[in-house]
Amino acid sequence: AHMWSDMFFRLAAEGDYYGHDVQLPAEVMKNLPSNISLAYWDYYHTEESHYDAMISLHKKFNRDIWFAGGAWTWSGFAPQTRFTYATMQPALKSVRKNKIENVLITLWGDNGGECPPFTVLNALYAIRRYADGEYDHGVIAAEFQKLSGLRLKTLIYWHCPISLPHHTRPTRSLILARRCYIPILFYVYMTERRSSGKPR
């Protein structure tokens, strides 16, 4: 069995999970059952060195480590594909370098689970190839198209309704989505209903 590790780190660091200078209590590490592995979850950071530091802290527990990454489906009705790439490529580089064998990728359903899982199929394939040590998106795109018949570049555009140009972090883009794109999509929806003769 594995436990998500933030509970131990937050106890030692007054609520902070991602601090690199946390002093983990020896008693906590010692009393963790030997059959429990730790899941280090992180979907936010874009620096490989950050993942290296966090994995190093987890190794102090002397337990098996899982890395839990994420393909961003939980910030609205469209995926955050660019931010998934920006976080998961350095994460998987660190995972390979630090010889972490167990990896899981989350697709959380926050905000009503509005984002269809299919829209991150390309991101999941890219993450899988990062785990293999392949980081060239040209190669990954060609493989993905051969395997699925779908163009990686086309699926990347799914993130556009809630993204700003050259903006990888998902926070502020949600404001744009709610103020601009959602009313536009509603207008398109109502226009299609009227043209099909369906009642409003």
Protein language model features and the residues they cover:
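Substrate-binding groove of N-acetylhexosamine-processing glycoside hydrolases
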Residues: A1-R200
